[in-house]
Structures are given as C-alpha cells and as structure tokens.
C-alpha cells in the first residue's frame, strides 16, 4: 500500500490526493474501494491518498447486501459520509466552506485511522474505468446516491397510489377503496402477480437498449439504426457509450448489481450487430474491443465460470462480431487485425470455439 511507494510519492499523494471520512462505520464490516476491500478495524475512519478521478466505494455489514457509490474525487478533496445505524446505510455530511481548512488540520490527528488507497490495484482500476467521467457518474448514478444489490422494490399499484396521494392532498382519488370507489386499479402480469419495479430514486439510470431476442442472435442482423439512436441520446459522444459499458461492468463485478450485468450484455450484443457501422464508427469499435479485452482479462476466473459462460452468451454474440468484421469491405485493416488478435486471445485463454460461418 502506501508504505511500498517511494517516500516522495507518498508525501505528494498525501498533499494532493483526496480523503474519504467514513464515520461511525461498524467494526469487522466489509469496506472497499475499486478493486480492494477489507474488514474494518476498531479505529477505522476512512481512506487517504485517493488519486483524483472516478472511484467506486462500497461496504456491507454482517450478511447485508453491498451498498456503494461512484464519486469523482478532486485533488485535495475531503468527502465525508456518516453511517446511520438505524437505517443501515451511509449519509452525506456536508463540510461548510469555512470549515474545510480546520477539517484538513484535523486529518493529521486522524492519520492512523485512515487506510491508504491501495495503489497496487490502481493500474487495473484505471484500465477498467478510463472512459468514465464525472458527467457519466452524474448521468447514470441513482438520484438517491446509493447503488445496492437489493434495491427497494415497489408494486406499480403502490406507486400509483403514492403518486395520487401527492397530487390529491385530500386523498379522494380513484384508487381509494370505499363505498364510492369499491374497486381500485390493479397492475398485474399475465399470471396475475403484482408488477414490481425499483422504487424511484434507487434505479441506476442506464440508457434504454432493447434486448435482442434469440431469433435475432445470428450473423446478418443489422441494427446500426439502434446504435445511432443511442449515440444521439448520448450527445453524439461514443466515448460515453463505452463509459456506460464500463460503469455497468463495475456495478456488477464490484457492486453485485445484476442489472449492471444485463446492461453490459445489451451493449455487447448491440455492438456485435452493426455491420454497416464498422467503417463510419471504426474508432468506436477499435476502442470497444480494447475495453472488452481488458474487462475479460481482469475478470476473476469464477466470474466467468458462474456467470459469463453459463449460457455461452459471449461466444455466441462475439461470433457475430468477428464474422461481421471479417466480411466487411469497410472495416479497415487495422480493425480487422485487432479483432483477429482478440479472437485468438479468447480462443487461447478460454478455449472458446467461435463459429463464424
């Protein structure tokens, strides 16, 4: 950690790195940032020497699900969170501008209670998140500021009633059950079960990408129009599409949020079904392959065995991408070469068989 770095680097990062004060967090609980997590000790009060940029902080107590947040740390910033033992979650604690200098002076007395950022994992973390910006975090992060693997669910019926109560303060709305309104609106699926959704404010605000069906999972499918609509929704910035792919991957890998995995798959599937875009969006596809290569390279082995390889999703989907690039007259030699190298790496590393015919 910090002690393994040259003293001058440690001194520089202490002066220019960010600080996270995580006050009141229970002892012997899980606390992590990016690629590293620990069991907290009795004196734990947070982290020091955090390199500027986007990081993912997460924690859990006992057998509770992980909760976390993304934050774009600035040089010298002091971010304060306070643990609420009653609600078992963290809350923001604002530091008034006129108290920042005093808070920085207090850090010296807290030094032994602050864990240094795990720099041995920083290169891997940066490689997983290099497209993610402060704008990405602001756009995607849940409004209530917490990412959780077990987000609070609410039925559409309950949500409808709650919204109606807000709009009609006298509570006399059509979903009230009384003599005048003996029946209320029901929201059920085809099996008669309540339709559930994540409560407003808790959802990760991913871009809407229609999933492809099994019948659409074949070479020759062309969905460049969907890709262009998605890019327009992102202000024409293809880097933000890759940023969303990266943030979705981290949400699943470190946040243990299954919807992150689903969004990651949807992006890969879409990118594999756009042969007409290979020439005009070559830079996007070149970077896409690099991002996916690094994600698969850094992924724990059990992640693949338990999740990615379960339904052969990647072999089936990437077979379409490899065939589209191979057969394209517009992809260009550099994209074809990079794709062929990626395919060979996957074949050698994971023994995957790509049927591109």
UniProtKB/Swiss-Prot annotation:
Give the transmembrane region(s).
none
Q: Name the Pfam families on file.
A: AAR2, AAR2_1st
BP terms from Gene Ontology: spliceosomal tri-snRNP complex assembly
Domain of life, per UniProt, equals Eukaryota
| InterPro entries listed in its UniProt record | AAR2, AAR2_C, AAR2_C_sf, Aar2_N, AAR2_N_sf
Q: Which family does it belong to?
A: Belongs to the AAR2 family.
Name the chain's protein.
Answer: Protein AAR2 homolog
Q: Which organism is it from?
A: Caenorhabditis elegans
């Amino acid at each position: 950690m910090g002690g393994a770095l040259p003293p001058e680097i440690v001194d520089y990062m202490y002066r220019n790195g960010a600080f996270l004060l995580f006050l009141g967090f229970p002892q012997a609980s899980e606390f992590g940032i990016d690629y590293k997590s620990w069991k907290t000790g009795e004196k734990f009060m947070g982290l020091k020497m955090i390199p500027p940029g986007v990081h993912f902080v997460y924690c859990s107590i006992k057998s509770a699900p992980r909760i976390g947040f993304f934050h774009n740390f600035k040089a010298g910033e002091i971010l304060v969170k306070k643990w609420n033992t009653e609600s078992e979650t963290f809350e923001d604690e604002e530091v008034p501008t006129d108290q920042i200098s005093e808070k920085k002076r207090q850090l010296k007395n807290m030094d032994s209670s602050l864990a240094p950022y795990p720099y041995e994992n920083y290169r891997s973390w940066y490689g997983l998140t290099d497209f993610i910006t402060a704008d990405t975090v602001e756009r995607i992060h849940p409004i209530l500021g917490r990412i959780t693997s077990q987000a609070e669910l609410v039925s559409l019926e309950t949500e409808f009633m709650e919204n109606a109560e807000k709009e009609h303060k006298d509570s006399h709305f059509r979903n009230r059950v009384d003599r005048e309104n003996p029946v209320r609106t029901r929201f059920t699926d085809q099996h008669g079960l309540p339709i559930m959704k994540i409560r407003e404010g808790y959802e990760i605000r991913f871009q809407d990408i229609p999933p492809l069906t099994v019948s659409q999972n074949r070479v020759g499918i062309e969905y460049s129009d969907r890709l262009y609509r998605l890019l327009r929704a992102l202000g024409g910035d293809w880097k933000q599409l890759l940023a969303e792919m990266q943030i979705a991957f981290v949400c699943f890998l470190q946040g243990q949020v299954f919807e992150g995995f689903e969004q990651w798959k949807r992006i890969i599937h879409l990118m594999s079904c756009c042969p007409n875009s290979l020439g005009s969006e070559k830079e996007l596809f070149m970077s896409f392959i690099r991002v996916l290569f690094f994600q698969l390279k850094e992924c724990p082995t059990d992640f693949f065995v338990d999740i990615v390889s379960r339904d052969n999703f990647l072999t089936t989907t990437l077979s379409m991408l490899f065939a589209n690039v191979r057969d394209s007259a517009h992809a260009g030699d550099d994209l074809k070469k990079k794709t062929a190298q990626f395919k060979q790496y996957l074949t050698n590393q994971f023994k995957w068989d790509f049927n591109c015919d």
